[in-house]
Amino acid sequence: MQVAAIFIDAEIEDQAQELRKFFKKLGAEISEDKSSKGIEDDLHKIIGVCDVCFKDPSLHTVEEIDAVLNSVVSIIVSIPLERGENLILAFCEKMTKAPDQKLAQVCLQSLWRLFSNLELTSPLRYHVYYHLVQVAKQVDQVKEVFTGVEQLKNQFTQCPPSNEQMQKLYRLLHDVLKDTNSELASKVMIELLGTYTAENASYAREDAMKCIVTALADPNTFLLDPLLSLKPVRFLEGELIHDLLSVFVSEKLPAYLQFYQNHKEFVNSQGLNHEQNIKKMRLLSFMQLAESNPEMTFAQLQDELQIGENDVEPFIIEVLKTKLVRARMDQKARKVHISSTMHRTFGRPQWQQLRDLLHAWKANLTLVQENMKSVAEAQIELTRKQ
């Protein structure tokens, strides 16, 4: 996200007095006179009434309000860090109170200016960013301030937030992303669970359940096996949500249908869509079949996936679109030929398979190298004889 840089051609004391006059004219309970206690007290009182400009937007243009808030931010960043914490927190809180989207957009820009102009080593950047995400949600611009977990971590490399602060931020990000970007929301929840240790994993029950539900509901998340290794998820072993996750990790469609038949109310109570679950389980079942069957007939797929004869080809096309499986469809022979597939689980057998494959490649490369060496030696010998 980019906004204009802060540049106010006036002394901060003069700016503060102009702001006092401006807010006074709007009806705010504030004196026009400078505070005898200094600029920090001026700023404290200005921030306390700055939201008065939100009450009747018709009195001023959005651009004018933006300029006023820009002036407030320019004073805030001039205050020494050790004395500015309460001022920054108060300003951030005011910026979340915009009554409509146009003003919320102005507040978003003001918070971004503040965030961008704080020292990279300032611990207050975390608090500004947290409120920034809240306001971005209001104007549907979360993607402008958050693009991924790595980008987030990079922003705080010089002053990392505490573990508890990151957990709070991850929960907020999940909440604002879950309805618009389920894939990214799922990644955020997995990152959140990764912040728990063996000592406190038992307290992450709610987060773990949200993480599982988000991953199951996301139509683009198919590799679910890593969730089972997360400590908070392990504490759910024996509970229905963990049993359901295990079905999605390694079982086929019939196992899910049986689970749903036995626990229909539970599945629905988690906000999961049964039809979407079936669709996902069919795809996961196909992947599992593809691991051990380089060739499958349409009839076999009909039986295994419980789909109609006319639905087989459209289903295969949908599978190929995910790029999880590479295959060729033979419509005449009514077969599908598998080239490769992503494994649903990656445990010891898969590591062994990968080891064997790499050893085979190594042996083949060694053979090629020896053959090339023999050809080169023969060529040299032939040249000598000539």
From Swiss-Prot:
Domain PCI: 181-343
Single GO biological process annotation from the record: formation of cytoplasmic translation initiation complex
Main localization, broad class: cytoplasm
Domain of life: Eukaryota
Keywords, comma-separated and alphabetical: Cytoplasm, Initiation factor, Protein biosynthesis
Any matching Pfam family: eIF3m_C_helix
GO molecular function, a single term: translation initiation factor activity
Family matches, as SUPFAM superfamilies: ARM repeat
Stored InterPro entries: ARM-type_fold (IPR016024), COPS7/eIF3m (IPR045237), eIF3m (IPR027528), eIF3m_C_helix (IPR040750), PCI_dom (IPR000717)
Compartments, record wording: Cytoplasm
GO CC terms, sorted: eukaryotic 43S preinitiation complex; eukaryotic 48S preinitiation complex; eukaryotic translation initiation factor 3 complex, eIF3m
Record bears the keyword Protein biosynthesis: yes
Secretion signal, residue range per the UniProt entry: none
Complex and partners: Component of the eukaryotic translation initiation factor 3 (eIF-3) complex.
Function: Component of the eukaryotic translation initiation factor 3 (eIF-3) complex, which is involved in protein synthesis of a specialized repertoire of mRNAs and, together with other initiation factors, stimulates binding of mRNA and methionyl-tRNAi to the 40S ribosome. The eIF-3 complex specifically targets and initiates translation of a subset of mRNAs involved in cell proliferation.
PANTHER family per UniProt: COP9 SIGNALOSOME COMPLEX SUBUNIT 7/DENDRITIC CELL PROTEIN GA17, EUKARYOTIC TRANSLATION INITIATION FACTOR 3 SUBUNIT M
Protein family according to the UniProt entry: Belongs to the eIF-3 subunit M family.
Protein name stated in the entry: Eukaryotic translation initiation factor 3 subunit M
The species this protein was found in: Culex quinquefasciatus (Southern house mosquito)
Organism placement in taxonomy: Eukaryota, Metazoa, Ecdysozoa, Arthropoda, Hexapoda
